[in-house]
Amino acid sequence: MGLNIVLVPAYWDLIEPQEGKFNFSLIDKAIEQARKNELKIIFLWFGAWKNSMSCYAPMWFKNNYKKYPRTRTETGKPLEIASPFSENVFQADSKAFVKLMQHIAQIDSTEHTVIMIQVENEIGMLENARDYSEEANRLFNSKLPDKLTTYLQKNKKQLHPWLYDKWQQAGGKIKGTWQEVFGKDIYTDEIFMAWYYASYVERMIQCGRKVYNLPMYVNAAMNSRGRKPGEYPAAGPLAHLIDIWHCAAPSIDLLAPDLYDKGFTDWTAQYKLHN
């Protein structure tokens, strides 16, 4: 086919099977094989989330619910989705990610076989549009972050049409809780979660770039076939949420929609914004 780049998963559970003990043999092998075949690599960090779920987190992480809490449904049921509101989750995920970036820098900063990193994989909430854990509820009922209100004001005439219409239909307020600013529905839940997922990713990228400055991107599971948030992985970097992601995670270099449906041109056109 003449392709010259391969996308290779970097599995957290295989890299750190025991807490604090790292094994990069599969990373080394992938880079070795790529060089032999004159290929470049984009590593996909399967860390806290892969296709919404935390299926590639290590067992020591999965088994410690108290230290590494999961998101919860509205009825309080825990999901196998690590909470983006937990500092312990972030610290464990980012520590392993930084170790990966350090290792790549040590073995590849001259040859540059690795050209880009995907941070997490198809982030998003399932079953519900947002997390209903105690910390999530506290933040949901708090005022919008100043950074977001400033962005809304500054970019009012250039927002994605969906976000602008939703905001204006709720009254166009600048100050208030998430529901006071965006209205009381499932899509406000999604906006809220998008902010905190994007904020988490921004911190991950900043941590990784401190040790090795590679381009980094995030991919998105699409909201096709008329599904509602939670029926698809809600709050990922979808077109209608692009302003939220741009504001909370300005360090992301690319947003990459995962397209399994027809209509590539139509899907990608939805991402077109002034910035």
Question: Could you describe each region identified by the protein language model?
Answer:
Residues F46, A129-S133, N137, T265, ...:
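Aromatic- and carboxylate-enriched substrate-binding clefts and catalytic-loop regions
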Residues L39, R203-L214, L241-N275:
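Catalytic-core region of carbohydrate-active enzymes that cleave or remodel glycosidic bonds
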Residues L26-K29, L100, P233-W245, K262-W267:
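Alpha-helical scaffolding within the catalytic cores
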Residues I5-L7, E38-I42, H112-Q118, N213-Y217, ...:
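Structural preference for beta-strand elements that scaffold enzyme active sites
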Residues M1-R70, A194-V211:
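Aromatic-lined substrate-binding rim segments of carbohydrate-active enzymes
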